[in-house]
Amino acid sequence: CTGQGGFFGDDEPEEMPFEYDLTIEDMWNDIPINQTSASDIINMTYDFEKSPRITNLTEIGYSMNGQPLLLVEFGDYDPAIPTVYFVAAQHGNEPASVDSAYLLARHFARGSPEEVDPILEKINLAVFVMVNPDGRDAGSRGNANGTDLNRDHMKLLEPEGKIMQKAFQKIHPSVTVDMHEFGGAGTIIFQVAAPQNPTTHPDVLAASYVLETDVIEAINEEWGFGSVTNYPPTTSSQDSSIHRNHFAVHGSVSL
């Protein structure tokens, strides 16, 4: 579903009418059969600028190959309520994370007031729709340099790693969700992992585990087939250069 027709095929309107008539059920019907290109996702995300719910739509930086990296922010950034931050597609060969983040941002930009407005009264929301557009286009796990961006949060050798740090410092999120995709046709469809680095503040770890449990319970109630992953902890899963571990160490409840 690439090319001029974009995410919605040839029916995509030139002007996005923000009539707020989409429901969550509508979103599932808009999921494409074929993967969109990085430029498709970028161009469609720019359309969100027309939504009055958007606080900021920022080109927060550029990928190794010069593609814009977009951060979408909703809400008034009231310090009295939590900020929830979604990050998608550090790994370019995990397309579902980008599509999910795009649909999430689209729902909050265009969704019905009955579904969206009560949530935005309780949280500030930020969505980093696509961290690794070069990897998405190449179908590769790493960025254009072949680097696994989810192992670059300590050294910050890559531009995308630096930009993720910049976004985090801009937002100061209460909760951070790092979105991935796992292959294989098994019985476990949804996997959730909490931070495991032992230097994380105990309160952040405890809150992350509560959130992990709540998410798994909600998944299993709605769809089933949810599971905790990376447990028990290993040396690899405790790596401080992994997104959920790194930003939990910096005080954000993380998954």
Question: Where do the language-model regions lie?
Answer:
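M14 metallocarboxypeptidase catalytic domain recognition
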Residues: 1-255
